[in-house]
Every structure is written in structure tokens, then in C-alpha cells.
């Protein structure tokens, strides 16, 4: 229980610093670059704390009596998601101030960044790789995403972009 508490406190402090302090925001960007590039010792620390997080979630799932057929990790869809976005610039996405965005206003939703000016996919960009991977592995007729109200706008944008790329994701 010490590890989840430590992770929670670090996450809360990091999130607050990211929002309140421009130098912290820059530092987070540098750390992300190190993780993506697998630069030591940052990458090993990330793997270690990621394992702590997964162990904790596993204990929660066991307590709830639930299981999952498969876990999908961001690292699995980083490249494919980014490539799907790049392949659809000028069709679904557009370049804007060095980033690649989905201009959602014309579809009744809002604009979001899918690839940053530094060339890294955002959560939205990675979702572009996740949908096709999930479909490839499970060949579903329908996918349900149970999320909180604070995430509904995010998924509205993601689902609209996916639908425009591949009609299998429509509706």
C-alpha cells in the first residue's frame, strides 16, 4: 500500500506543478522525451513505477472479482497511432503551428492536438492506433467505453476522427 500512495502523491504533485509552473511543464516534456527514447536512468525508473501501478490495479481487479482478456498499453500504439495521424493529414487532420490537430468544429465537436510540435502523439493520437488494434484482435460488432463525464468530450473527438478514417468505427 506504500507504493500506490507514493505514486498517487507524486501524480498529484506533478499534475499541480505542470498546471502552475512553466518550468515544471518543460521538465515533464523532457522526461517524456527520455522515456520515449528509452534514455537511462529515466526509462528504468518509469518501468519500475509502471510495474507498481500495474500490481496495484491487479489487486483491485482481484478484489472486485473481474478480469480482462487483454491489456493494451500506450507503448504498443505510440508509433501506429502517430503514423495513422500522419497518413491522414489533409484528410482528417491538419497542421497548425507545428502540431497536427483535428479541427472538430466542422463536425460539431472541438479541436484537439493529436501530434505535438515535438512530434509526439498525444493520448488522442495514440487512440488512433488503439481502435484498429482492438478491432484486429477482437473483431467486435460494437465497443462500449464506460468513462466519466469529464472524458466524454475527449472521446467524442477521438471517435469522430476514427470514424472519418475508417467507417468500421462509425456509430
Task: Tell me the role of every PLM-derived stretch.
Residues 1-171:
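NTP-dependent nucleotidyl-transfer catalytic core
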Amino acid at each position: 500500500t506504500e507504493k500506490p500512495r507514493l505514486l498517487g502523491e507524486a501524480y498529484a504533485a506533478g499534475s499541480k506543478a505542470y498546471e502552475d509552473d512553466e518550468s515544471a511543464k518543460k521538465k515533464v516534456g523532457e522526461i517524456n522525451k527520455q522515456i520515449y527514447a528509452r534514455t537511462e536512468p529515466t526509462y528504468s525508473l518509469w518501468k519500475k513505477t509502471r510495474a507498481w501501478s500495474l500490481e496495484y490495479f491487479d489487486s483491485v481487479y482481484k478484489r472486485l472479482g473481474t478480469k480482462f482478456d487483454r491489456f493494451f498499453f500506450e507503448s504498443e500504439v505510440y508509433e501506429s497511432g502517430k503514423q495513422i495521424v500522419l497518413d491522414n493529414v489533409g484528410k482528417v487532420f491538419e497542421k497548425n503551428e507545428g502540431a497536427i490537430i483535428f479541427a472538430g468544429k466542422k463536425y460539431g465537436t472541438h479541436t484537439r492536438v493529436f501530434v505535438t510540435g515535438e512530434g509526439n502523439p498525444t493520448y488522442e493520437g495514440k487512440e488512433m492506433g488503439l481502435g484498429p488494434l482492438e478491432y484486429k484482435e477482437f473483431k467486435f460488432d460494437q465497443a462500449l467505453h464506460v468513462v466519466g463525464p469529464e472524458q466524454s468530450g475527449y472521446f467524442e473527438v477521438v471517435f469522430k476522427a476514427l470514424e472519418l478514417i475508417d467507417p468500421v468505427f462509425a456509430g
